[in-house]
Amino acid sequence: MKRAIGIAISTALLAMGAAGATAQGAPASAEPAQLVESGHIVVDGRQTAYVIHRLPTDSFPQLPEQVAAVLNERGCMVPQTYEAHRPENVIHASLERAGSSDWAALCSAKGTVSLMVFFGTALETPMVLATAPETERLQPHDPSGVLGFNWGIDRASPEQVHEAQAGMDQRPAPPGHDALADSRIEHRTIYHFYTKGAWTLLEMPDQ
């Protein structure tokens, strides 16, 4: 966010979900435990409340064991946007080349969020494409003024990339494999694309 943001004192981690299941007599493991962090940051000189929801890696059973192990070793939780209705910010796509089986995830650990990519050819050695303090990925989203997490990632197929490039004076042909869509809600989406052994940002029309 472009506004100056500073971290205030109060931050609390509250375990959710498991307590509700236990209260009804169900095993605590019946639902994945969702962590909720609440606190305050300074926005434009005023204390502003925020809430961040995160999920553990076992909320994503499709993750390969090697990927989950790396995320767990780094103490990662997966932050969820304030729009989330199901587990998000873990994707499976062909990011290295056409037909490859690759993964990407947002990792929240020690107050920092990192965008990590795991190629199928090297699942235990992820690449980090971007990092940011978690409190710099917050924005208001309802009349209460409480801030929520706004960073999301998605698979972008060649067709979706080509559609996003509509309106360019010299519109490129669709790329040869998936890109990684990197978005902040209500902001511009950027597209990471791996080609010739390096990551690049795909050109998009002015927004």
Language model: regions and residue ranges:
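Bacterial N-terminal signal peptides that target proteins for export
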Residues: 1-9
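Acidic, small-residue rich beta-repeat scaffolds with periodic aromatic anchors
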Residues: 5, 17-58, 134-207
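Short N-terminal edge-element motif at the start of the domain
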Residues: 62-97
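Short secondary-structure junctions
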Residues: 75-81, 125-128, 199-203
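Acidic/hydrophobic-patterned starts of short beta strands in beta-sheet-rich repeat architectures
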Residues: 94-107, 173-181
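Primarily extracytoplasmic ectodomains and periplasmic/lumenal surface modules that are beta-strand-rich
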Residues: 99-101, 110-113, 124
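Structural motif
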Residues: 111-117, 188-191
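Extracellular C-terminal loop/segment signatures of secreted glycoproteins
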Residues: 117-134
